[in-house]
């Protein structure tokens, strides 16, 4: 992943100041921009020396051939050519070394932040752009992990014994509810023209490196080894889908490409603590339905609005109150030029919590993956790369948590209407007592603005 190196070259029509400003609003290393510029010059100078040495070497070889043809000794020229050949070997190694260093310096520099992103380094200041639904509020509403236990929908103790911390067995109605959400989510997107993809669960290291940030390898991704191969379990189906068209030219007439990915996801979730670790809200393994779109560069921003709208409609149909926020510049991951989060209302917590993340990564990923937009036309100076966007539709364990809290009653869980055909019932009764015998009081409702 990374920016176009041409953007760093002011003499070639680039705009280094734009990158510096973007790094500044990301609260990232601005000096890294100059480091890339300086290294780029070293690469060009080293390649220039290599080209000149290759040209001299070719001339000497030609002279050797002429000497031999004339029956004359070419020993002196051959010795000179051998010296040049050794220089060429060293210069090639030097070029490889500085190019590798340049790529390492280039990779941590984030995508250009879109002008509509709020400038701040505190996510408490994310810009609220929309709210929907009525938020239930009441003292004593149960949390999702308590409700999941009361419907006998999971077994965290045995999961921990078998697989470790934050692992679990879904069981009984928990399995069926999980599958109902998957089926409803897939149908929701196929009706909107998306092609379903069930992805591989692991990726080759070199391919993963083109679509994941370096820090993800340590903090998020599980490594799998076998047969002398390094692979990584996926953290989201966005990762394999982004590489689905790698090294391809996609004609404009075949764009946009809309996919809905279905996969199990695996995350270390290093550093997570507190209430995030309760129940199945933030776990090491879960299913997720993901939107992924590929567009012409000029059309990606319209597509971003379409994608977040798809997610909004999904949660509206489920009757989940939510808000959409425009994420502040300092909280953007490197690939995202802009990101929306859709946060669902969790009445047990009396707060909004993230359900959806929708990002426009522009051409930041497609460059490394070499996914180009149309064949290069005559007179066109540079290759044109597609823009790539991703958006959660449903991380099923989180959706289960949100449904349980919003649809809890004194006797059980009311099933949201869209899930009833897939689940075969409209109510899930409690079969276990509330933990600590906590009672569920009568509920009242309020609008998000009244919270």
From Swiss-Prot:
<feature type="binding site">
    <location>
        <begin position="354"/>
        <end position="357"/>
    </location>
    <ligand>
        <name>ATP</name>
    </ligand>
</feature>
<dbReference type="InterPro" id="IPR006195">
    <property type="entry name" value="aa-tRNA-synth_II"/>
</dbReference>
<feature type="binding site">
    <location>
        <begin position="236"/>
        <end position="238"/>
    </location>
    <ligand>
        <name>L-serine</name>
    </ligand>
</feature>
<dbReference type="InterPro" id="IPR033729">
    <property type="entry name" value="SerRS_core"/>
</dbReference>
<feature type="binding site">
    <location>
        <position position="392"/>
    </location>
    <ligand>
        <name>L-serine</name>
    </ligand>
</feature>
<dbReference type="GO" id="GO:0045335">
    <property type="term" value="C:phagocytic vesicle"/>
</dbReference>
<dbReference type="GO" id="GO:0005524">
    <property type="term" value="F:ATP binding"/>
</dbReference>
<keyword id="KW-0030">Aminoacyl-tRNA synthetase</keyword>
<dbReference type="GO" id="GO:0002181">
    <property type="term" value="P:cytoplasmic translation"/>
</dbReference>
<protein>
    <recommendedName>
        <fullName>Serine--tRNA ligase, cytoplasmic</fullName>
        <ecNumber>6.1.1.11</ecNumber>
    </recommendedName>
</protein>
<comment type="subunit">
    <text>Homodimer. The tRNA molecule binds across the dimer.</text>
</comment>
<feature type="binding site">
    <location>
        <begin position="267"/>
        <end position="269"/>
    </location>
    <ligand>
        <name>ATP</name>
    </ligand>
</feature>
<keyword id="KW-0963">Cytoplasm</keyword>
<dbReference type="GO" id="GO:0005829">
    <property type="term" value="C:cytosol"/>
</dbReference>
<keyword id="KW-0067">ATP-binding</keyword>
<comment type="function">
    <text>Catalyzes the attachment of serine to tRNA(Ser). Is also able to aminoacylate tRNA(Sec) with serine, to form the misacylated tRNA L-seryl-tRNA(Sec), which will be further converted into selenocysteinyl-tRNA(Sec).</text>
</comment>
<dbReference type="InterPro" id="IPR045864">
    <property type="entry name" value="aa-tRNA-synth_II/BPL/LPL"/>
</dbReference>
<dbReference type="InterPro" id="IPR015866">
    <property type="entry name" value="Ser-tRNA-synth_1_N"/>
</dbReference>
<feature type="binding site">
    <location>
        <position position="290"/>
    </location>
    <ligand>
        <name>L-serine</name>
    </ligand>
</feature>
<keyword id="KW-0436">Ligase</keyword>
<dbReference type="Pfam" id="PF00587">
    <property type="entry name" value="tRNA-synt_2b"/>
</dbReference>
<comment type="similarity">
    <text>Belongs to the class-II aminoacyl-tRNA synthetase family. Type-1 seryl-tRNA synthetase subfamily.</text>
</comment>
<dbReference type="Pfam" id="PF02403">
    <property type="entry name" value="Seryl_tRNA_N"/>
</dbReference>
<keyword id="KW-0547">Nucleotide-binding</keyword>
<dbReference type="GO" id="GO:0000049">
    <property type="term" value="F:tRNA binding"/>
</dbReference>
<dbReference type="InterPro" id="IPR042103">
    <property type="entry name" value="SerRS_1_N_sf"/>
</dbReference>
<dbReference type="InterPro" id="IPR010978">
    <property type="entry name" value="tRNA-bd_arm"/>
</dbReference>
<dbReference type="GO" id="GO:0006434">
    <property type="term" value="P:seryl-tRNA aminoacylation"/>
</dbReference>
<dbReference type="InterPro" id="IPR002314">
    <property type="entry name" value="aa-tRNA-synt_IIb"/>
</dbReference>
<feature type="binding site">
    <location>
        <position position="283"/>
    </location>
    <ligand>
        <name>ATP</name>
    </ligand>
</feature>
<comment type="pathway">
    <text>Aminoacyl-tRNA biosynthesis; selenocysteinyl-tRNA(Sec) biosynthesis; L-seryl-tRNA(Sec) from L-serine and tRNA(Sec): step 1/1.</text>
</comment>
<keyword id="KW-0648">Protein biosynthesis</keyword>
<dbReference type="GO" id="GO:0004828">
    <property type="term" value="F:serine-tRNA ligase activity"/>
</dbReference>
<dbReference type="InterPro" id="IPR002317">
    <property type="entry name" value="Ser-tRNA-ligase_type_1"/>
</dbReference>
